[in-house]
C-alpha cells in the first residue's frame, strides 16, 4: 500500500493524504525467445539490468510499499522532508501523483528496463495501475 495526495485538486478530498492497496499490471510484446516466451517473469529476479540501482522487485517495493509519494512541486514539501528525516514516513518524490501518473511513471521505468534487459527484443506496451480494485488507469504510448 502507498499514500499520496494530489495537492492541485483543491476542490476535492484528494488534496489530502489518502492511501490504497495498489497493484500494477504490465503488458509486454516482442519476439519469442528460444523457450517460446516473450518475457521470462521469473527472470526478473535474475535480471542484470537495474532500475535506479535496484533489482526490479526491490525497486517496486522501494517506491510503493508503505511509502508516501509526493509531487515534486508540492507546496508542503518541507513538512514531508522533515517527517522523512524523523523516520515518520518513507518519502518518495516524483513529478506528479495520481493513478494516471503512477501508470506513466512505472511504464517509463519498466519499458527502459525491459528494453535493456532483452537487448530490444521486448517492450512494455501498457501499464495498468489499480487502486483498491475499484479505480484503474492505463498508460501506453
Task: State what each model feature region is.
Residues 1-141:
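Charge-rich, low-complexity N-terminal segments
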Amino acid at each position: 500500500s502507498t499514500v499520496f495526495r494530489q495537492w492541485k485538486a483543491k476542490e476535492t478530498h484528494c488534496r489530502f493524504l489518502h492511501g490504497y492497496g495498489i497493484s500494477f499490471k504490465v503488458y509486454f510484446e516482442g519476439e519469442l525467445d528460444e523457450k517460446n516466451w516473450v518475457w521470462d517473469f521469473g527472470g526478473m529476479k535474475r535480471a542484470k539490468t537495474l532500475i535506479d540501482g535496484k533489482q526490479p522487485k526491490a525497486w517496486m517495493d522501494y517506491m510503493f510499499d508503505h511509502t508516501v509519494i509526493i509531487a515534486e512541486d508540492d507546496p508542503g514539501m518541507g513538512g514531508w522532508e522533515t517527517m522523512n528525516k524523523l523516520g515518520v514516513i518513507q518519502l518518495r518524490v516524483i513529478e506528479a501523483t495520481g493513478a494516471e501518473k503512477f501508470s506513466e511513471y512505472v511504464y517509463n521505468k519498466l519499458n527502459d528496463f525491459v528494453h535493456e534487459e532483452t537487448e530490444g527484443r521486448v517492450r512494455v506496451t501498457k501499464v495498468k495501475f489499480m487502486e483498491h480494485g475499484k479505480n484503474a488507469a492505463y498508460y501506453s504510448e
